[in-house]
Amino acid sequence: MAPIDVGDFVPDGSISFFDDDDQLQTVSVHSLAAGKKVILFGVPGAFPPTCSMNHVNGFIEKAEELKSNGVDEIICLSGDDPFMITACSENKHVKFVEDGSGEYIQLLGLELEVKDKGLGVRSRGFALLLDNLKVIVVNVGSGGDCSLFQLMKMTTTTMSNLPTDLLEEIISRVPRKYMRAVRLTCKRWNGMFKSQSFTKMHIGKEEAATRELRQTRMIVMMDYNVYLMGIAVNEIPSIETLGKLTCLDDSEQVKISQVFCCEGLLLCILKDDDTKIVVWNPYLGQTRWIQTRLICCVSGWKKYALGYGNNSENRSCRSPKILRVTDNFNIFSENIPLQYEIYDFDSDVWTTLDVSPHWFIMSERGLSLKGNTYWGAKERHAYGSIDHIICFDFTRERFGPLLPLPFSAWGAQFASLSSVREDKITALFQNCRAYKLELWITTKIDVNNATWSKFFTMDTPYLHEILSLKTFFIDEENKIVVVSNKERDTKGDLTHDSIDIINGEARCLWKLGLGKPADKNCWPLVCPYVPSVVQIKQHKGGKTKEQSDYKRH
């Protein structure tokens, strides 16, 4: 039979392998390769020197790189019996299968006659690149030798010659953890990440995959570092660290004390440096460092917010702004140093705003919603806890009126605020004496108005632990509340960071450990994460600094 060639469809046939439970399975080639991009390579038998050194090990070592180029499955076909194959099948990136009779090798036309040596029919050394069963690359060696480098070069060349729209469609399916390898492959592939059509396509596919897996993705700050994490919402939730986010080279890595999210952009406040802050798009790997104005205010504290002026219908073209509020802890003093400043990305200038507040912003963190920022607040000279919210409008650069919360928090009652995918405001009301937990969500919200609906009420003996939370968010689709927390020992001392998962519908709570922090005073922070295609503008003379979106943890 003529050897298989480019353009042919790979024939079907039966092959065998041992599964993870060491059970022998016999399946068809088509069941493994249909609808996928697959590398099928063959060796004459287990452990001949040429195959072991130049062929099998090469595919094992390059498996992740090949998969970053869009390969879904790597299959090694040998003429040995399946029991011999188990000896070299420990690697999870390559599937080792057996064609002991040589029937499938003969269907491919790649048999090697060695009957004169008493070995019967064996396979030539070969490698095929299949796309939905169709052969697009063939590489056949002699005596078992087959160049992995040549196949990888042909694979990359073949993909790079594809039309742009088709190439974008293929690479947009590559999982995020392989994206750094993709970007480093060639200039053309790296350039795709600056294309609006590609980034939107990739984000859409990533979000669809996340929904299918019932996974919630979030930004977590702990120990002054920032991580991308995912929570699998199953019967028993689990948490996975997807990567450590980094906006600088390792040699320059800084500690981050606060993170503020706005439509996929992060505003990062440095732990040990008041002279600058950084705005960061983790998805595009872009940063912009901004010098701050020094303020002599020993007893003051600073609150930051990141937002947009809504002057453009195209979100990717809107220019961000930063608000910094400097206020004093003593809310009953008449002579309080106050300063409201706004930074404009286009002009690269800080401007002082003329604000005479009759309110006091209670929450340390603001919430981004449709380009504006909302805080928990109260009347400036009133007693009590948070009982209102107030909005800063980044388009008009002014505050709106105080908007009442649907409850009043006094004494052993507490209120915390968050947002739902930056579309709604949520308020968590905690009553320590009655062991009640209420979650409210806005049905309408803008600068001047807010209406609320109760999302759920929950009785919980864990309330005393939840009271110490700093941040939370709600995942409406999976019907859970995600809360940052710290655990305590029997003496009441802080021990380790954790994530609390509250299911209001099932009336249950799970705790997921994050580990013991190096600094017990650094409270973990959580916020939902959705990738952004917004390009970060640089100030005049500046240059966009691009890094990989995250390092695999």
Swiss-Prot record:
Reaction catalyzed: [glutaredoxin]-dithiol + a hydroperoxide = [glutaredoxin]-disulfide + an alcohol + H2O
Keywords: Antioxidant, Oxidoreductase, Peroxidase, Redox-active center, Ubl conjugation pathway
GO biological process: cellular response to oxidative stress
Leading EC class: oxidoreductase
SUPFAM superfamilies: F-box domain (SSF81383), Galactose oxidase, central domain (SSF50965), Thioredoxin-like (SSF52833)
Superkingdom of source: Eukaryota
Ranges of residues in domain Thioredoxin: 4-160
InterPro entries the UniProt entry points to: F-box-assoc_dom_typ1, F-box-assoc_interact_dom, F-box-like_dom_sf, F-box_dom, Gal_Oxase/kelch_b-propeller, PRX5-like, Redoxin, Thioredoxin-like_sf
Molecular function as annotated in GO: thioredoxin peroxidase activity
Record-annotated active site: C51
Residue stretches making up the F-box domain: 156-201
Signal peptide: none
EC numbers on record: 1.11.1.25
Subunit and partners: Monomer.
Annotated function: Thiol-specific peroxidase that catalyzes the reduction of hydrogen peroxide and organic hydroperoxides to water and alcohols, respectively. Plays a role in cell protection against oxidative stress by detoxifying peroxides. May be involved in intracellular redox signaling.
PANTHER family xref list: PEROXIREDOXIN, PEROXIREDOXIN-2A-RELATED
Recorded family membership: Belongs to the peroxiredoxin family. Prx5 subfamily.
Further comment: The active site is a conserved redox-active cysteine residue, the peroxidatic cysteine (C(P)), which makes the nucleophilic attack on the peroxide substrate. The peroxide oxidizes the C(P)-SH to cysteine sulfenic acid (C(P)-SOH), which then reacts with another cysteine residue, the resolving cysteine (C(R)), to form a disulfide bridge. The disulfide is subsequently reduced by an appropriate electron donor to complete the catalytic cycle. In this 1-Cys peroxiredoxin, no C(R) is present and C(P) instead forms a disulfide with a cysteine from another protein or with a small thiol molecule.
Protein name: Peroxiredoxin-2A
Organism of derivation: Arabidopsis thaliana (Mouse-ear cress)
Organism taxonomic ancestry: Eukaryota, Viridiplantae, Streptophyta, Embryophyta, Tracheophyta
